[in-house]
Amino acid sequence: KSSAASDVYKRQNQNFVSETFANYSQMFDKHEVGAMVGHSYEWYQYRDSYLTANGFVNEALGNENMGAGEKANNIISNGFSKSKLVSGMARLNYTYDNKYLLTATFRADGSSKFGKNNKWGYFPSGAISWKAHEEKFIKKLNTFDELKFRLSYGISGNQGISPYQTLSRYGTTKYYHQGQWLTAIGPGYESGQSGQDGIWKIWSGIPNPDLKWETTAQWDFGIDMAFFNRRLRVTLDIYNKETSDLLRERNLALSSGYDRMWVNDGKIRNRGFEVTIDGVMVDKKDWSLNGTFIFSMNRNKVLDLGSSVESGLLKDARTGMEYEVVGNLSEQYRSYTNILAIGQPINVFYGYKCDGIIQTLPEGL
């Protein structure tokens, strides 16, 4: 009998997107009006299958006769998931005298990933800008080829989770235990063995029918400038972004038989500014030389971790800092630990500081 093993793996992704838009524009006197309405439909499906076998009589057929392997060691598994996203959107643009610009946008998105009462999210946004270089008093300065001020505010949504997170899910993964592949389901249920040798499988998913869209509110202020016949361009941007109802996996007490579940809680803030300078240093007929300088400073901070979580936060005895460990609680005993701490950047490292290296045996005792 041969010790050869054979594996066959197949994965298929299918994605269908349909978008329909209607546009309108009209100019009269110093006014310009534009409008757009649209509809989008997206369908996604994933499927995979995996076969493995060993203990063949010989290797002549390769993986073309998987059934010839030892039945006790054969593994057959497959996965399937699908999701849908339906969106409607509208935008209105208005410009007066080619100086003052206004944009208003609204969109509604419905995702199959969320619960019955939270499938839809509604996200408005707006922006205004002023082309100051078109004003007579700016033109008299003979300095700017372009001087534009921008201000915007908007709310956007995130559905970045796998399908079925709102449902109760049992795990069917097989584990190799005492010489055979076994499947275990649900907390408190043993599979294939008894007593202390039994396999205990943490439930694949705790249902949360209240899962909803994660939302981000952001404002931006910017200035665009151009000099020397637009050979030098300078762009300044300042932004503040706050994300609430974070979609994340919350740690649960291991004594519950579960490890984590998807929830909406907490808030983080990102803010900063960016400066970009583009210059055309040489512009000849046969060659040119351009340069770009970029400087940015960005900061993020955890503002809160949700009222339901904060009551069970860990606390640093020395500093009083409240925090939650990122990932499975059991992992903190054997790997680097990231934490979510109120007032700190997201996923900061947290652990002991080194006091030195032990050089002799007595030092380590």
Locate each region found by the language model.
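A detector of mature, structured extracytoplasmic domains
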Residues: 324, 338, 347-361
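Extracytoplasmic gating/loop element in the C-terminal half of outer-membrane beta-barrel translocons
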Residues: 68-70, 111, 348, 357-365
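Extracellular/periplasmic, surface-exposed regions of secreted and cell-surface proteins
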Residues: 3-332, 337-340
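Extracellular/surface-associated beta-sandwich interaction domains
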Residues: 265-267, 330-333, 352-354, 359-365
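Extended ligand-binding clefts on enzyme/binding-domain cores
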Residues: 343
